């Protein structure tokens, strides 16, 4: 069995987030002052986690967020970030740069509702989901290949320290599962991956995990909580399990969804 952890973080706040302006892919807005503080708070929260791989969308707000996270890390300060366009936000076409209220008005005029409505030049939800699936399958193949190489050239079993570094910081509660499912007979994590992306993208990825992978989620979470947009720097953690040989889809367990305890005090205006 090959197991790995996937920690997904939304970028920090931008000025346009606060003003409820659609950014999508075409408006490459930097983080606001609050956004930088959120990224730093996320970094402090994750500072003891030993990530083996770090990926980010190639848009400015995610680049600045992942940098803010890693500069607080005890173990990952010098880690190379792989920027991937497949992690970009949903493309909103003509709605980019316009208020969210206008997007909702466009949807209403078309007899549809957000987020299912696709503005002209935008990306459909199915296209967004396929993009997320493509990245996830690439990631799985990368981890399986590296795990196979490590198994071939090293007699050492996967280390339990990757998992313990996660288990120590993610508190149990309403948004968290009760365990990482790591009993004595379960191998340690082969990898611990950090991904920094965007609100609509992460919501689509959650839908893929729920409907396609039949991922188990914390029982206390409602369907509406699973489909809501993550807060800025909200964190969602999955454990993926591949049976020996790595054939077929992995089984997936969600440890927590849109965790935001690290933001206590950060978002308060003085």
Swiss-Prot record:
- Residues annotated with N6-acetyllysine modification: 50
Any single GO BP term: autophagy
Q: Which GO-annotated molecular functions does the record name?
A: fructose-2,6-bisphosphate 2-phosphatase activity
Q: What is its main location?
A: cytoplasm
Question: Which cellular compartments is it found in?
Answer: Cytoplasm; Nucleus; Mitochondrion
CC per GO annotation: cytoplasm; cytosol; mitochondrial outer membrane; mitochondrion; nucleus
Q: Where is the active site?
A: 11 (tele-phosphohistidine intermediate), 89 (proton donor/acceptor)
Keyword set for this entry? Acetylation, Apoptosis, Autophagy, Cytoplasm, Hydrolase, Mitochondrion, Nucleus
Q: Where is this site: Transition state stabilizer?
A: 198
Coiled coil regions in record:
none
Catalyzed reactions per annotation: beta-D-fructose 2,6-bisphosphate + H2O = beta-D-fructose 6-phosphate + phosphate
Which InterPro entries does its entry note? Answer: His_Pase_superF_clade-1, His_PPase_superfam, PG/BPGM_mutase_AS, Phosphoglycerate_Mutase
Q: Name one Pfam family in it.
A: His_Phos_1
Q: Which PANTHER family match?
A: FRUCTOSE-2,6-BISPHOSPHATASE TIGAR
Q: Belongs to which family?
A: Belongs to the phosphoglycerate mutase family.
Subunit structure of this entry? Interacts with HK2; the interaction increases hexokinase HK2 activity in a hypoxia- and HIF1A-dependent manner, resulting in the regulation of mitochondrial membrane potential, thus increasing NADPH production and decreasing intracellular ROS levels.
List the protein's name: Fructose-2,6-bisphosphatase TIGAR
- Source species: Bos taurus
């Amino acid at each position: 069995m090959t197991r790995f952890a996937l920690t997904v973080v939304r970028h920090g706040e931008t000025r346009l987030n606060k003003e409820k302006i659609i950014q999508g892919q075409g408006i490459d807005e930097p983080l606001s002052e609050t956004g930088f503080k959120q990224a730093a708070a996320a970094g402090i929260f994750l500072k003891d986690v030993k990530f083996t791989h770090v990926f980010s969308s190639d848009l400015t707000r995610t680049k600045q967020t992942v940098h803010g996270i890693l500069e607080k890390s005890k173990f990952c300060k010098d880690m190379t970030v792989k920027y991937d366009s497949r992690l970009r936000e949903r493309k909103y076409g003509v709605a980019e740069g316009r208020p969210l209220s206008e997007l909702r008005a466009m949807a209403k005029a078309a007899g549809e509702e957000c987020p299912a409505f696709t503005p002209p030049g935008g990306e459909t939800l199915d296209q967004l989901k396929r993009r997320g699936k493509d990245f996830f399958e690439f990631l799985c193949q990368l981890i399986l290949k590296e795990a196979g190489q490590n198994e071939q050239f090293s007699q050492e079993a996967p280390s339990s320290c990757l998992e313990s570094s996660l288990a120590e910081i993610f508190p149990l509660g309403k948004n968290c599962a009760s365990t990482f499912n790591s009993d004595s007979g379960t191998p340690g994590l082969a990898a611990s991956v950090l991904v920094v992306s965007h609100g609509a993208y992460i919501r689509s990825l959650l839908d893929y995990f729920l409907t396609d992978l039949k991922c188990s989620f914390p029982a206390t979470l409602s369907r509406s909580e699973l489909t809501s947009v993550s807060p800025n720097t909200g964190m969602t953690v999955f454990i993926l399990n591949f049976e020996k040989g790595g054939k077929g889809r992995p089984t997936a367990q969600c440890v927590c969804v849109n965790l935001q305890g690290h933001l206590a005090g950060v978002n308060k205006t003085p």
